[in-house]
């Protein structure tokens, strides 16, 4: 194992044509194109052997990424880590780009060392949406009350049981997740919902976004939203957000995730603002 190096990648992709990050294999064949599948095909071409590419987490179909982390182990000793950037990009479809590559400790794991995942949903708020924005924004023909939405969002902090926003098929052993930051912002017709947590349940962000907007449209009080959150009853969800219009980023640390890391990261987020979108 001493002859194997671990390389950490930063990846951006347009997820429109992909079933998500993770491969979906039937027998020996991939059922639908995936981001992981495309990366592993290229890694195999570069190394002339099968190479596993491990991502920081799964994403739903149609999710775009600006900074997802993934790692692979390479037996190549003489290539500098940054040279994997053009090596991969010359063979990948244009919808997937490697934006950074660096050698890391063998103890770092893209999934288990990840301290935070961030989703951004983009909603185009206008009577008519621009055609070129439709693949990347959810169109709603009204302007929601951003003040009320942020009042709801302010209740999503710290460790919370997210059963109310879990999908029917979610198989997570624990439904608790740790929220770092949740807020709405508005800029040039686009309302953005940003949520950062240690991890998410399957389709949880879609369900949560839909519930927030459903509550805002009904003019629910903050207390009513909190009641849904703590009910642990997914039947109280609002209609889920459609799949398009959201992007994903990951922050990783050389240390395995711990409560101590949580508290440190929460303090750092409060003082660094957009720095939370840096991958490493």
Swiss-Prot record:
It catalyses: uridine(38/39/40) in tRNA = pseudouridine(38/39/40) in tRNA. One of its GO terms (biological process) is tRNA pseudouridine synthesis. Keywords: Isomerase, tRNA processing. The gene is truA. The active site is at residue 60. InterPro entries: PsdUridine_synth_cat_dom_sf (IPR020103), PsdUridine_synth_TruA (IPR001406), PsdUridine_synth_TruA_a/b_dom (IPR020097), PsdUridine_synth_TruA_C (IPR020095), TruA/RsuA/RluB/E/F_N (IPR020094). Substrate binds at residue 119. It is an enzyme of class 5 (isomerase). GO terms for molecular function: RNA binding; tRNA pseudouridine(38-40) synthase activity. It holds the Pfam family PseudoU_synth_1. CDD domains: PseudoU_synth_EcTruA. Formation of pseudouridine at positions 38, 39 and 40 in the anticodon stem and loop of transfer RNAs. The keyword Transit peptide does not apply. Homodimer. This is tRNA pseudouridine synthase A. Its EC number is 5.4.99.12. Belongs to the tRNA pseudouridine synthase TruA family.
């Amino acid at each position: 194992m001493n002859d194997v190096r671990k390389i950490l990648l930063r990846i951006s992709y347009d997820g429109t044509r992909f079933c998500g990050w993770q491969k979906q294999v039937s027998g020996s064949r991939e059922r639908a194109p995936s981001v992981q599948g495309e990366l592993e095909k290229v890694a195999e071409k570069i190394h002339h052997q099968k190479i596993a590419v491990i991502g920081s987490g799964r994403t739903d179909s149609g999710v775009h990424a600006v900074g997802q982390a993934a790692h692979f182990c390479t037996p190549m000793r003489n290539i500098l880590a940054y040279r994997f950037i053009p090596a991969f990009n010359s063979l990948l479809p244009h919808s997937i780009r490697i934006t950074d590559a660096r050698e890391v400790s063998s103890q770092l794991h893209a999934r288990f060392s990840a301290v935070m995942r961030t989703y951004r949903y983009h909603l185009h708020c206008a009577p008519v949406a621009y055609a070129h924005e439709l693949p990347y924004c959810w169109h709603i023909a009204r302007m929601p009350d951003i003040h009320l939405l942020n009042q709801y969002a302010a209740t999503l902090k710290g460790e919370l049981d997210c059963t109310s926003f879990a999908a029917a098929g979610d198989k997570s052993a624990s439904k608790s997740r740790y929220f770092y930051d949740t807020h709405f912002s508005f800029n040039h017709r686009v309302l953005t919902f940003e949520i950062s947590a240690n991890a998410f349940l399957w389709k949880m962000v879609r369900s949560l976004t839909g519930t927030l907007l459903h509550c805002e449209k009904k003019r629910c009080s903050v207390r009513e939203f909190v009641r849904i959150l703590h009910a642990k009853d997914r039947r109280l969800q609002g209609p889920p957000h459609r799949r398009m219009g959201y992007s994903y980023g990951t922050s990783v640390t050389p240390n395995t995730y711990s409560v101590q890391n949580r508290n440190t990261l929460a303090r750092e987020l409060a003082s660094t603002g957009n720095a939370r979108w840096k991958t490493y």
